[in-house]
From Swiss-Prot:
Pathway: Cofactor metabolism; pyridoxal 5'-phosphate salvage; pyridoxal 5'-phosphate from pyridoxal: step 1/1; Cofactor metabolism; pyridoxal 5'-phosphate salvage; pyridoxine 5'-phosphate from pyridoxine: step 1/1; Cofactor metabolism; pyridoxal 5'-phosphate salvage; pyridoxamine 5'-phosphate from pyridoxamine: step 1/1. This is Pyridoxine/pyridoxal/pyridoxamine kinase. The keyword ATP-binding applies. GO terms for cellular component: cytosol. Its cofactor is Mg(2+). ATP binds at D125, T157, E162, T195, H221, S222, R223, V224, T231. Mg(2+) binds at Y136, E162. Homodimer. Substrate binds at S23, H59, D233. NCBIfam families: PRK08176.1, pyridox_kin.
Length: 283
């Protein structure tokens, strides 16, 4: 490799509003493979940092790939500083993490980053599992979330199962889920969005519950029967985008849910097993 540095003028460095840290697939629409195009549709710039790189989700008959090595992962984060690409950074969002050591590396990076960006919004989707599947990450990840990432986050987006794992509390009814979410709030952690709270099965509704220190807001949406993957990643991408575009939290959550429903229906109309983003209509 030539020793000549072609691109060493940092004044020309690309800048991003968001750094998105989560999984990536070669084929499919989960993790950053759906989040990045969704964020860009909202007119925001994003850098994608992969935690795992997979051929596709495990729901196909072949499956390749795995977690990014720690040396590479820490290098990806370090390179953003070395390129001077974080001058305009406004938010970091995290999703599926490959290892507990990645979580520790990320937390150290975020702690240092916040010194230069004290108003940085950190949103954590603590991907651990769900009621149907149980825990589907490595068993040391839940404690790593509790120890390293939750103390840094302003907002988190667990499902009911993940809320139970993080708090050690039963959350199968609305009141207990709200109480568990409130137990996580702190001077830093301002809100919890429970993404799969108990809905009305008979009326085909699902609920998203927004919990903060002084309010609880229950948002109901139509339930769509589907096996599509990546809807949670899309929801978080829409949510962080809405917040950065100045939407209030409850409004951003409501709009994000509506967008996910729109994408799911559009995907079903096109008979695809992977999410397809229709054009985004500005409201």
């Amino acid at each position: 490799m030539s020793s000549l540095l072609l691109f060493n003028d940092k004044s020309r460095a690309l800048q991003a509003d968001i750094v998105a840290v989560q999984s990536q697939v070669v084929y499919g629409s989960v993790g950053n493979s759906i989040a990045v195009p969704a964020i860009k549709q909202n007119g925001l710039n994003v850098f994608a940092v992969p935690t795992v790189l997979l051929s596709n989700t495990p729901h196909y008959d072949t499956f390749y790939g795995g977690a990014i090595p720690d040396e590479w992962f820490s290098g990806y984060l370090r390179a953003l500083h070395e390129r001077d690409a974080l001058r305009q950074l406004r938010a970091v969002t995290t999703g599926y993490m490959g290892t507990a050591s990645q979580i520790k590396i990320l937390a150290e990076w975020l702690t240092a980053l916040r010194k230069d960006h004290p108003d940085l919004l950190i949103m954590v989707d603590p991907v651990i599992g769900d009621i149907d599947s149980g825990i589907y990450v490595k068993p040391d990840l839940p404690e790593a979330y509790r120890q390293y990432l939750l103390p840094l986050a302003q907002g988190i987006t667990p499902n009911i199962f993940e809320l139970e794992i993080l708090t050690g509390k039963n959350c199968r009814d609305l009141d207990s889920a709200i109480a568990a979410a409130k137990s996580l709030l702190s001077d830093t952690l301002k809100w919890v969005v429970i993404t799969s709270a108990s809905g009305n099965e008979e009326n085909q509704e699902m609920q998203v519950v927004v919990v903060s220190a002084d309010s609880v807001n229950v948002i109901s949406h139509s339930r769509v029967k589907t096996d599509l993957k990546g809807t949670g990643d899309l929801f978080c991408a829409q949510l962080i985008s809405g917040l950065l575009k100045g939407k209030a939290l409850n409004d951003a959550v409501h709009r994000s849910g509506l967008r996910v429903l729109e994408v799911m229906r559009y995907t079903q109309q096109h008979e695809s097993d992977e999410l397809i983003l229709p054009p985004l209509a500005e409201a």
